[in-house]
């Protein structure tokens, strides 16, 4: 089970976008995340008339490394760490380390 999953709200804790919040759009295999509205880059694309694509400057999100983001705790309003807890029925759930509350409630 991953500590940070798709659609989790995260906050950037290091880098040029430090302090920005967004949701996870994609989880990549190399330990990176694509976060909405964070780490924006400008991509210069050529027009492709065969596919009907127009050229120009396209702004999109670039991947950000997992060590530069942390899950955002709504209750405390700060970045938090993720822990795991095994419940009585044997299921494994994610919890916030600071408040011991369940993330996937």
UniProtKB/Swiss-Prot annotation:
InterPro entries referenced in this protein's UniProt entry, alphabetically: KOW, Rib_uL2_dom2, Ribosomal_uL24, Ribosomal_uL24_CS, Ribosomal_uL24_KOW, Translation_prot_SH3-like_sf
Any Gene Ontology CC annotation: ribosome
GO BP term, example: translation
Keywords per UniProt: Ribonucleoprotein, Ribosomal protein, RNA-binding, rRNA-binding
Signal peptide: none
Molecular-function GO terms, alphabetical: rRNA binding; structural constituent of ribosome
Pfam families for the chain: KOW, ribosomal_L24
Matching PANTHER family: MITOCHONDRIAL RIBOSOMAL PROTEIN L24
Record text on subunit structure and interactions: Part of the 50S ribosomal subunit.
NCBIfam families documented for this protein: rplX_bact (TIGR01079)
Primary role: One of two assembly initiator proteins, it binds directly to the 5'-end of the 23S rRNA, where it nucleates assembly of the 50S subunit.
Family: Belongs to the universal ribosomal protein uL24 family.
Name of the protein in its database record: Large ribosomal subunit protein uL24
Organism: Chromohalobacter salexigens (strain ATCC BAA-138 / DSM 3043 / CIP 106854 / NCIMB 13768 / 1H11)
């Amino acid at each position: 089970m991953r500590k940070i999953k798709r659609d989790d709200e995260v906050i950037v804790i290091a880098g040029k976008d430090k302090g920005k919040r967004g949701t996870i759009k994609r989880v990549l295999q190399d330990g990176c995340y694509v976060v909405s509205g964070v780490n924006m880059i400008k991509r210069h694309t050529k027009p492709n008339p065969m596919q009907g694509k127009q050229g120009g400057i396209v702004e999109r999100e670039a991947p950000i490394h997992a060590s530069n983001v942390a899950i955002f705790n709504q209750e405390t309003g700060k970045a938090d760490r993720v822990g795991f807890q095994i419940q009585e029925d044997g299921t494994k759930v994610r919890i916030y380390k600071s408040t011991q509350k369940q993330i996937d409630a």
